[in-house]
């Protein structure tokens, strides 16, 4: 039987996430979180067809789907904004909207439209 890491074919991109976080918010990303680039089907089987990235609170892990119709760097930043607003009770609430659309998006601009 293939190892779970092999079947998921994940690629750790935590360092890229940490560098991006530091550029946006000028503080350290929480140390115990890991970020992985995975096949989109891994995410979509568990969370629905329209989901490209997911934040797994219990595992302290962020999964970003590759080969989706959305740019993977934008999905990464989208999920980092969720991590930044972890205590907000609403999924895409006003604090998340501010962090993603008013802080991260203007700073990164067209760089968001790239693939990892």
Regions found by a protein language model. Give the residues of each.
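Walker B catalytic acidic pair
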Residues: 79
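Active-site-proximal or metal-binding-adjacent scaffold patches in catalytic folds
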Residues: 1-74, 83-116
């Amino acid at each position: 039987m293939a190892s779970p890491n092999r079947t998921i074919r994940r690629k750790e991109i935590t360092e890229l996430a940490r560098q991006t976080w530091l550029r946006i918010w000028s503080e350290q990303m929480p140390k115990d979180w890991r970020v992985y680039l995975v096949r989109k089907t891994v995410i979509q089987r568990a969370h629905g067809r329209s989901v490209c990235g997911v934040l797994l609170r219990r595992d302290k892990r962020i999964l970003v789907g590759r080969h989706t119709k959305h740019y993977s760097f934008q999905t990464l930043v989208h999920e980092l904004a969720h991590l930044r607003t972890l205590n907000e009770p609403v999924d895409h609430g006003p604090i998340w909207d501010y962090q993603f659309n008013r802080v991260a998006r203007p700073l990164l601009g067209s760089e968001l439209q790239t693939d990892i």
